[in-house]
Amino acid sequence: MDTSHAIKSCVLILLVTLLCAERAQGLECYQCYGVPFETSCPSFTCPYPDGFCVAQEEEFIANSQRKKVKSRSCHPFCPDEIEKKFILDPNTKMNISCCQEDLCNAAVPTGGSSWTTAGVLLFSLGSVLLQTLM
């Protein structure tokens, strides 16, 4: 086996390993509570190993004005319709959604997670490197 072929094999194995490796850090979620829809929420690492990113949106009447607020967080489980039963006011509407991908609880979909970006960059680098070695 010549040196060129060995290097190509090592690079290919390294690329496959990096692209298939499980995420080393925890789930990334946005976190904020009861903020206006226009407000951006900072991201944080979910402390639960099998946690869920949760997006909650509430619409209610306060001082004769309709208001909309959002909350973003991480939970060890996905809240469901049971959570809504604690609201006694019939003028309040609440939507809850759960997901298990990085930063998936945004109000407006983002351009993708940092893992997607890293994967694309790594794949591009690997392609260039393989072409250079051939």
Swiss-Prot record:
PANTHER family cross-referenced by the UniProt entry: LYMPHOCYTE ANTIGEN 6H, LYMPHOCYTE ANTIGEN 6S
**Lipid-modified residues, GPI-anchor amidated glycine kind:** 112
Q: What is its main location?
A: membrane
Q: Which PROSITE patterns match?
A: LY6_UPAR (PS00983)
Which ranges of residues are annotated as propeptide in this record?
Answer: 113-134
Q: Where is the signal peptide?
A: 1-21
- Keyword Lipoprotein attributed: yes
InterPro entries given for it?
CD59_antigen_CS, LY6_UPA_recep-like, LY6H/LY6L_nAChR_modulators, Snake_toxin-like_sf
Q: What is this protein called?
A: Lymphocyte antigen 6I
What topology in the membrane does the UniProt record assign? Lipid-anchor; GPI-anchor
Q: Which tissues is this protein detected in according to the database?
A: Expressed in hematopoietic tissue (spleen, thymus, bone marrow). Also found in peritoneal macrophages, peripheral blood leukocytes, liver, heart, brain, kidney and lung.
- What does the UniProt entry say about where the protein is found? Cell membrane
Q: Which residue range or ranges hold the UPAR/Ly6 domain?
A: 27-105
- What is the native source organism of this protein? Mus musculus
Q: Which cysteines are joined by disulfide bonds?
A: 29-53, 32-41, 46-74, 78-98, 99-104
Spell out the GO cellular component terms annotated for this protein, sorted alphabetically and separated by semicolons. Answer: plasma membrane; side of membrane
Report keywords, A-Z: Cell membrane, Disulfide bond, Glycoprotein, GPI-anchor, Lipoprotein, Membrane, Signal
Glycosylation site list: 95
Q: What is any Pfam family matched here? A: UPAR_LY6
